[in-house]
């Protein structure tokens, strides 16, 4: 199942008795406030992003539950040595403009090994993160087709009868990873996704409407790619 990685941003977190109690649900012995460092990940929201995708509100709520207990890695490397923090709570926060955002609260122990990471976070040097998951459905905003089952002719970012096409990412199939990463060198870095969400290949005669012949060919070429990988 294809993985989608979305950029997230680290924020300062306050530690109180209630938060410490949530942290201690993840530990083998009770930790004190002086033993832990906490931070927040301002992750996905329900707005259309630069990839012309948005998470549904129900999916954000699912993610808030599914990511609790997952480790926070370094540079997408899966090993015990790169596990530097853990998610202890998740929630969906609303703003006045109607935006709903997934916020993951994380902790790490204060040790000699984690001291450089904590210093990098506190100084603002290390503040980028990616959140990885697989979704059950990718629904076209124009026709409603689930791209995991069949390909429609609509392309994200193109306009159809005054409406810009985007994909609604709906339902959490799996929560894979959270990873602290370096600042991306390119604006589009940090995204891994299936070009057409693992759906069926389009029939040879199928073309998106309104596009020039060269654009149609590019669309078909992209549909044949299984993954696009722009790593940090």
Where are these regions (language model features)?
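Signature of dsDNA virion morphogenesis modules
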Residues: 1-204, 215, 226, 232
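Short linear motifs in low-complexity, proline-biased tails and propeptides
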Residues: 212-224
């Amino acid at each position: 199942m294809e993985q989608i990685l979305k950029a997230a941003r680290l924020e300062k977190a306050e530690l109180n008795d209630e938060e410490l109690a949530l942290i201690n649900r993840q530990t083998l012995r009770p930790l004190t406030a002086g033993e832990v460092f906490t931070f927040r990940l301002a992750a996905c929201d329900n707005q259309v992003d630069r990839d012309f995708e948005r998470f549904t509100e129900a999916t954000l709520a699912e993610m808030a539950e599914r990511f609790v207990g997952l480790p926070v890695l370094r540079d997408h490397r899966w090993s015990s040595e790169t596990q530097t923090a853990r998610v202890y709570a998740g929630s969906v926060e609303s703003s006045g403009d109607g935006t709903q955002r997934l916020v993951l609260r994380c902790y790490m122990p204060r040790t000699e090994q984690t001291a450089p990471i904590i210093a990098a976070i506190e100084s603002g040097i290390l503040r980028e993160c990616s959140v990885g998951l697989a979704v059950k459905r990718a629904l076209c905003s124009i026709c409603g087709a689930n791209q995991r089952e069949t390909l429609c002719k609509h392309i994200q970012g193109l306009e159809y009868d005054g409406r810009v096409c985007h994909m609604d990412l709906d339902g959490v199939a799996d929560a894979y990873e959270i990873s602290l990463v370096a600042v991306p060198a390119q604006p589009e870095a940090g995204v891994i996704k299936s070009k057409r969400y693992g759906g069926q290949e389009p029939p040879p005669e199928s073309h998106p409407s309104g596009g020039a012949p060269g654009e149609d060919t590019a669309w078909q070429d992209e549909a044949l790619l299984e993954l696009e990988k722009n790593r940090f």
